Every structure is written in C-alpha cells, then in structure tokens.
Amino acid sequence: MKKKPNGYRYFCHLTGCLFGIFILAVLIINFLVPDRGFSQKENRVLTSRPAISVSQLKSGKFADDYETYVNDQFFLRDWWITLRATAQRILGNTEENGVFLGKNGYLMEDFTAPSQERLNRTVNAMTDFAARHSDLPQYALIAPNAVNILSDKLPALAAATDQNPYLDATAAALEKAGVTFVDVRDTLSQHKDDGIYYHTDHHWTTQGAYFAYMQLAKVLGIDSSSISYDKLPVSMSFQGTLSAKSGFRASEKEEMDVFLPRDDSVPSSVVNYVDEQKKTASFYDTSKLETRDKYAMFFNGNHGKVVITTPTEENRTLLVIKDSYANSLIPFLAPYYRKIVMVDPRYFYDDLEELMQVEEIQEVLYLYNANTFYSDTSLELALMPQSSTDSTPDSVETDNTDTTSASSANASADNPEA
C-alpha cells in the first residue's frame, strides 16, 4: 500500500491538535466565565447550575437539567446561534429552534400542542372559576399567533402544528360554562396584510392589537368609534425575541408604534404598579426603547398586579388575567372603565378570590396568546381556591386528526368538576 506523504500526515496531526486545543480552550473558558442570569438578546432568564441530589441523579433529571444549563451558559452562545442559523440557511433549512423563516421576512414560532391533561386542567380551572362567579360576565380572548393567521407565509413543506382544533375545543368548553369566547381569528385574517404581527418577534403589533380590540369592543358593549387614534412610530430599531431564538434575520430592525387619541378630552389614566409601589400617568415607559426589550415599553413589561384608574363616567371595573399580548391592547380599553386590574399569573402570588372582593370586580377578561395559554401552568394555579386540592380534570375533546391543516375542528367538553 502506498504511504501517505509526510506533509499530508503532518497536516492531519496539526489539524487534530488544533481542534483538540480549541475544544479544551472552550471547556476552560466555559468553566472560568461567570454564568449569565439573563440574556438581553433572547429576553429571558438563563438556566443556572442545577443542584446535585441522589434522587435527581437516579431519575436522570440532573442530567437533563445540566444539559439545559450548559446550552444556556455556553461561551459566546449568541454568536454560535447566529453562525448555526446562517449555515442552516445556506443549506436551505428554514426552521431553527422551533422558529420558521417564512416569506416576506416573517419569523414564526411553531405551536406546541398541549397534552390532553394540560388542556383539561387549564380549561377546567377556568370553567370552575366561572361557576364560582356566575354572577359576573366573563370573556376569553385567546389570540392566534402568526403561525396560524399568516400560515400562507410559512416556508414550503413546513410541518407547523395547527392551533385551530385547540382554539375550537377551548371555545366550546368555555361557552358551555358561560364564558364568552371572543374569536378574533376572522378579524385578524381579514387584516393579515396590514402588519398585524412583527417580523422578528412573537407578539402582535399595536395595529394587530387594535384590530382585536375592535372585535372585543363589540362583545363588551363598547362604542369603539367614540375615540379616534393616530399611529405614532416610537422606534425604528425593534428586534424581537424570535430573531435571537433562531439566529435568523439577526440584523433586521423594524418599526414599533403606539396609538394615541386624537381628542385631548379623552381622560388620562393613572397606572399603579402595586408590587413596585410606583404610580405613573402613562401606559408607556419610553426608557425601555433604549434597551433590548423594547416591547417592555408597554406597561414597563410584565408585573404581577397593575391597577389602572381612569376618571370616566363609566362605573365599570374589569379584571384582566393576561400575558404580554394584553399589554398593547389594554390602553384601548382604559377610557371605558373606571378601574382595570391586570393580573399576570406568572408573577402573581396572592389570593385572586380576595382580590375580586377588594377591587369590586364586575367583569373578567382572559387575554392571552395561544402559545402561552396552552403551555403555561400558572393560570390553573392562580384560579384555584387556595384551600382546594387536586382533582381529576374533565376531558376537553379536540379533533386533531390533521394537526398540520388549516381547517377548524369541532369540539365538546364534559361538565366541569370543582
């Protein structure tokens, strides 16, 4: 057999040594560099080093947690994400880390279907709450995400999970329990070419929130035509979390707007951030426009409890149980309510039943986006009476025979149990 030239063998040895040195250097740097608690680029808390215990070692949970920790704390994580996304895009891959690179530059987060148990628990917590407060009008607006409304902009052959069977099942179960489901899918679909979702973020734009508000106002008995708005651009450099999560469109910047009433006679509201013991006379914290998380301009981000009071002739009080999608919509509702109490169950740890009495709540509105609504567990815990114990949830049936299609499915639900 003919021997390889010495130069070739030398090149192979050198390459192997350099690669080994590189791996060793990265391991050492990962060990020496302090952990980061928060990723400004991804706008999320990063996983900290997990504690070791015998039970976690036996169950394998420690290994899973440690893998997540290493992934979050890896040296130059943001750079590696962008590099991988660039390489994947060159190879023709249009999906990275659960985010699709769609047409017209849209990044769309895939929908993770909830387990049947998760769906049952969330919906039954809401129907049980409705039964305990059957004297109050209750509404639910579960906003569809871009992957639903802008499905025509998904890349070819994208296997996106259909949200519609789950929204239909939720609507049927809630309506049966007396909770009015505010379905904004048709409204948003009619305006899908009007910039209702950000290109680089998972939120709807203020324009999208406004269209949803117009539909919600009809259900709430609000004359939305009584106030006209002007759209005011407040930033031209917004870059959302989907860009950071996927690495796609890393240099993309887009416009962020607010809607301001044209009529100066519209009463001003006072916003009370209860946990922070801070009051302001604006829905917007413009200092956030100088940060990575520009969407936090709306109500300074997410808080456990925020109380909005408005000197209006209306004597209505509204409890909004919400996620961040509500933040850009609530300013449209404020002029029509004497008091709006916003509760984000992810950060709220008090007794919701007591809050209902103290704040003299007259109406209840759930305002979520579908991705958060079907994955978060905090809503169930917040709605549960503090003295209650776990029970077997009733079944909320979904017709998901084709979860990648755009067709809706019929749904039904059993009677809720306490």
Feature map (PLM): residue ranges:
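Extracellular glycan-modifying ectodomains
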Residues: 1-418
